């Protein structure tokens, strides 16, 4: 029966001390695919190390440690089930990882769970101006995660106070509104990740709370629309030569469907080749769909002709093309000085890493409302949002964010850190000089 349930990717946002690991661990522990034996083993180790109070977070820590050591653990460990859905937790431990995962993410999050701590120091730290939590919420919204649930955590540390809950709810709700969420429709749930209050069952310690439990709230989310019906796009993660088979590009299907027999183009190059077979986890697939990480065999193409960052598409259905310029909305997160025209940092978009030049800063815009506040500003700095015209220094395949989200969002990197994030609005194609995008890039 379980097969018919829709899969939803859940990104958990929260300050390191918000208790998000304990909350997530507790849910996975109660509803997930962790077998009893594993849990008992973890509990025993946890007790021996005197970490009894971190039991649920410990579950997650162990999974992370095993994952980081390269032990392939059953992905079911990161899943939990509600009456309507299978949820997969996309956990992003650190700030840098969070930004990286949100942009080039192994999977696009459909829903965000924001965990904020109710304890006095905790909330102020997590939700201060400098707190990364706010930035992560803004990033999630900018990158298309429009559904969010808020867990007001550690209620056990404030004696399950309704006043404290209301105070936090007001502040977080105001911020969500500013960012652009429909805050009146967002569930704010008083929880204790450790004690389990209002996670799965209603707690008798919060008789004043009449709303849903965390799981009930997650179960009311709208299922994601998977882009099966869009033209095919597969950003290549690598290209391998396999004895007896030949050239095998590897990547994740972002949109569309791939079947053997299709004639593929590898943009931005002019290489065209027929797909002979498609495999996932060593099994031959009749068709690969969005979200599938696959390898596929192509005829008469050498490993030297195609590479990571190229995008495979169907020659007969709106094939991908290289792009000579594009305009994008960027949010500057972290730059020590000012960014002016001519700045040329590295751009990470899907699997490609290419230097791009800021041709022109077209306008500075209000992050919240999207309205233009200044035309052609001389410079932009941390905290600013702007519309900019960019030029890749090498041929590059990108798409508009509205048409192909995974190929239309990017991170700008410089000085070994993420300087900005952006989404692409308009393209100028490299196609015999013709502009085939929906709207030409601003000059």
Curated annotation (Swiss-Prot):
<keyword id="KW-0648">Protein biosynthesis</keyword>
<feature type="domain" description="tr-type G">
    <location>
        <begin position="5"/>
        <end position="228"/>
    </location>
</feature>
<dbReference type="InterPro" id="IPR004539">
    <property type="entry name" value="Transl_elong_EF1A_euk/arc"/>
</dbReference>
<comment type="function">
    <text>This protein promotes the GTP-dependent binding of aminoacyl-tRNA to the A-site of ribosomes during protein biosynthesis.</text>
</comment>
<keyword id="KW-0963">Cytoplasm</keyword>
<protein>
    <recommendedName>
        <fullName>Elongation factor 1-alpha</fullName>
    </recommendedName>
</protein>
<feature type="region of interest" description="G3">
    <location>
        <begin position="91"/>
        <end position="94"/>
    </location>
</feature>
<dbReference type="Pfam" id="PF03144">
    <property type="entry name" value="GTP_EFTU_D2"/>
</dbReference>
<feature type="region of interest" description="G2">
    <location>
        <begin position="70"/>
        <end position="74"/>
    </location>
</feature>
<comment type="similarity">
    <text>Belongs to the TRAFAC class translation factor GTPase superfamily. Classic translation factor GTPase family. EF-Tu/EF-1A subfamily.</text>
</comment>
<dbReference type="Pfam" id="PF22594">
    <property type="entry name" value="GTP-eEF1A_C"/>
</dbReference>
<dbReference type="InterPro" id="IPR031157">
    <property type="entry name" value="G_TR_CS"/>
</dbReference>
<feature type="region of interest" description="G5">
    <location>
        <begin position="192"/>
        <end position="194"/>
    </location>
</feature>
<feature type="region of interest" description="G1">
    <location>
        <begin position="14"/>
        <end position="21"/>
    </location>
</feature>
<keyword id="KW-0547">Nucleotide-binding</keyword>
<dbReference type="GO" id="GO:0005525">
    <property type="term" value="F:GTP binding"/>
</dbReference>
<dbReference type="InterPro" id="IPR000795">
    <property type="entry name" value="T_Tr_GTP-bd_dom"/>
</dbReference>
<dbReference type="InterPro" id="IPR009001">
    <property type="entry name" value="Transl_elong_EF1A/Init_IF2_C"/>
</dbReference>
<dbReference type="InterPro" id="IPR027417">
    <property type="entry name" value="P-loop_NTPase"/>
</dbReference>
<dbReference type="GO" id="GO:0003746">
    <property type="term" value="F:translation elongation factor activity"/>
</dbReference>
<feature type="binding site">
    <location>
        <begin position="14"/>
        <end position="21"/>
    </location>
    <ligand>
        <name>GTP</name>
    </ligand>
</feature>
<dbReference type="InterPro" id="IPR050100">
    <property type="entry name" value="TRAFAC_GTPase_members"/>
</dbReference>
<dbReference type="GO" id="GO:0003924">
    <property type="term" value="F:GTPase activity"/>
</dbReference>
<keyword id="KW-0342">GTP-binding</keyword>
<dbReference type="Pfam" id="PF00009">
    <property type="entry name" value="GTP_EFTU"/>
</dbReference>
<dbReference type="GO" id="GO:0005737">
    <property type="term" value="C:cytoplasm"/>
</dbReference>
<keyword id="KW-0251">Elongation factor</keyword>
<feature type="binding site">
    <location>
        <begin position="153"/>
        <end position="156"/>
    </location>
    <ligand>
        <name>GTP</name>
    </ligand>
</feature>
<dbReference type="InterPro" id="IPR009000">
    <property type="entry name" value="Transl_B-barrel_sf"/>
</dbReference>
<dbReference type="InterPro" id="IPR054696">
    <property type="entry name" value="GTP-eEF1A_C"/>
</dbReference>
<dbReference type="InterPro" id="IPR004161">
    <property type="entry name" value="EFTu-like_2"/>
</dbReference>
<feature type="region of interest" description="G4">
    <location>
        <begin position="153"/>
        <end position="156"/>
    </location>
</feature>
<feature type="binding site">
    <location>
        <begin position="91"/>
        <end position="95"/>
    </location>
    <ligand>
        <name>GTP</name>
    </ligand>
</feature>
């Amino acid at each position: 029966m379980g097969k018919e349930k829709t899969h939803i990717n859940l990104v958990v946002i929260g300050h390191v001390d918000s208790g998000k690991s304990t909350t997530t661990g507790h849910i996975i522990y109660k509803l997930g695919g962790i077998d009893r034996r594993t849990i008992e083993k973890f509990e025993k180790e946890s007790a021996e190390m005197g970490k009894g109070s971190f039991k649920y977070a410990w579950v997650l820590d162990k999974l992370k440690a095993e994952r980081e050591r390269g032990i392939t653990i059953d992905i079911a460990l990161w899943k939990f089930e509600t009456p309507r859905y299978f949820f997969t937790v996309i956990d992003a431990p650190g700030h840098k990882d969070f930004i990286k995962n949100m942009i080039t993410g192994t999977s696009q999050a459909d829903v965000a769970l924001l965990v904020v701590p109710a304890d006095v120091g905790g909330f102020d730290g997590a939700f201060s101006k400098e707190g990364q939590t706010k930035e992560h919420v803004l990033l999630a919204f900018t990158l298309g995660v429009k559904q969010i649930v808020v867990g007001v955590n550690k209620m056990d540390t404030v004696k399950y106070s309704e006043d404290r809950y209301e105070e936090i709810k007001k502040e977080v709700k105001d911020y969500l509104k500013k960012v652009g969420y429909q805050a009146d429709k967002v569930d704010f749930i008083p929880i204790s990740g450790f004690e389990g209050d209002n996670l799965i069952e209603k707690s008798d310690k919060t008789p004043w709370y009449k709303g849903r439990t965390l799981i009930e709230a997650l179960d009311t989310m709208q299922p994601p629309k998977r882009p099966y019906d869009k033209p095919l796009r597969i950003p290549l993660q690598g290209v391998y030569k396999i004895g007896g088979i030949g050239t095998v590009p590897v990547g994740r299907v972002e949109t569309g469907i791939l079947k053997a027999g299709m004639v593929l183009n590898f943009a931005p190059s002019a290489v065209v080749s027929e797909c002979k077979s498609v495999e996932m986890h060593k099994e031959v697939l009749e068709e690969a769909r969005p979200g599938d990480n696959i390898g596929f065999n192509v005829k008469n193409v050498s490993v030297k002709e195609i590479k990571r960052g190229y995008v495979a598409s169907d020659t007969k259905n709106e094939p991908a093309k290289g792009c000579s310029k594009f305009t994008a909305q960027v949010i500057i997160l972290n730059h020590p000085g000012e960014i002016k025209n001519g700045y040329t940092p590295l751009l990470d978009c899907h699997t490609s890493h290419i230097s791009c030049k800021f041709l022109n800063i077209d306008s500075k815009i209000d992050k919240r409302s999207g309205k233009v506040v200044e035309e052609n500003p001389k410079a932009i700095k941390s905290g600013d949002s702007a519309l900019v015209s960019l030029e890749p220094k090498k041929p590059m395949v990108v798409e508009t964010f509205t048409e192909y989200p995974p190929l239309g969002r990017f991170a700008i990197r410089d000085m070994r850190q993420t300087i900005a994030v952006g989404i692409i609005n308009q393209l100028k194609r490299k196609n015999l000089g013709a502009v085939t995008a929906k709207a030409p890039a601003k000059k």
